[in-house]
Curated annotation (Swiss-Prot):
One of the record's GO molecular function terms: rRNA binding
Gene: rplE
Family: Belongs to the universal ribosomal protein uL5 family.
Keywords for this protein: Ribonucleoprotein, Ribosomal protein, RNA-binding, rRNA-binding, tRNA-binding
Function summary: This is one of the proteins that bind and probably mediate the attachment of the 5S RNA into the large ribosomal subunit, where it forms part of the central protuberance. In the 70S ribosome it contacts protein S13 of the 30S subunit (bridge B1b), connecting the 2 subunits; this bridge is implicated in subunit movement. Contacts the P site tRNA; the 5S rRNA and some of its associated proteins might help stabilize positioning of ribosome-bound tRNAs.
InterPro entries per the UniProt record, alphabetical: Ribosomal_uL5, Ribosomal_uL5_bac-type, Ribosomal_uL5_C, Ribosomal_uL5_CS, Ribosomal_uL5_dom_sf, Ribosomal_uL5_N
PANTHER family xrefs: 60S RIBOSOMAL PROTEIN L11-RELATED
Quaternary structure note: Part of the 50S ribosomal subunit; part of the 5S rRNA/L5/L18/L25 subcomplex. Contacts the 5S rRNA and the P site tRNA. Forms a bridge to the 30S subunit in the 70S ribosome.
Official protein name in the record: Large ribosomal subunit protein uL5
GO annotation terms (biological process): translation
Length: 180
């Protein structure tokens, strides 16, 4: 079963962007390659229960088991040693990526309190977009009673776009609610 957002991309977004940027080939049109969802544990790195709950939450939100990221070197100021878990990360591609993006754009982002759109300044200069989410409760899959602490996450959307303008056009057509 193909995802709704993938169908919309190939049927409406590709022809629109091809005309807007005067591409000669359909493969020049920017597309989303992958979405990475990252959560740093911070002070919870000493707590094994916080690590397990973070893994479970990210698996529920993304539909894929996260990888535990570990410290590369010891930092005494942060009380971490080499090899200690410092975060969890998921890389989504193809069908799961489109499913996650669809849920993020149409369900999760509108549930943010006092939501007026996301900032358009978070592009990296190469057409990739990053956004931070302050609480995991905006996702409908998360049960309010089952969370021990409100934690945020970082979401990076990596595209084949060459410029920020192309990346913004792609994400706007996909329905990303940028602030005016």
């Amino acid at each position: 079963m193909t995802q709704r957002l993938k169908t919309v991309y190939y049927e409406t977004i590709v022809p629109k962007l091809k005309e807007q940027f005067n591409y000669t080939n359909i493969h020049q049109v920017p597309k989303v390659i992958k979405v990475t969802v990252n959560r740093g544990l911070g002070d919870a790195s000493q707590n094994a229960k916080a690590l397990e709950s973070s893994i479970a939450e990210l698996a529920t939100i993304t539909g894929q088991k996260p990888v535990v990221t570990r410290a590369r070197k010891a930092i005494a100021g942060f009380k971490i040693r080499k090899g200690m878990p410092v975060g969890v990360m998921v890389t989504l591609r193809s069908e799961r990526m489109y499913a996650f993006l669809d849920r993020l754009i149409s369900l999760a982002l509108p549930r943010i309190r006092d939501f007026r759109g996301i900032s358009g300044n978070s592009f990296d200069g190469r057409g990739n977009y990053s956004l931070g989410i302050r609480e995991q409760l905006i996702f409908p899959e998360i049960d309010y009673d089952k969370i021990d602490q409100i934690r945020g996450m970082d979401i990076s959307i990596i595209t084949t776009a060459q410029t920020d303008e192309e990346g913004r056009a792609l994400l706007t057509e996909m329905g990303m609610p940028f602030r005016k």
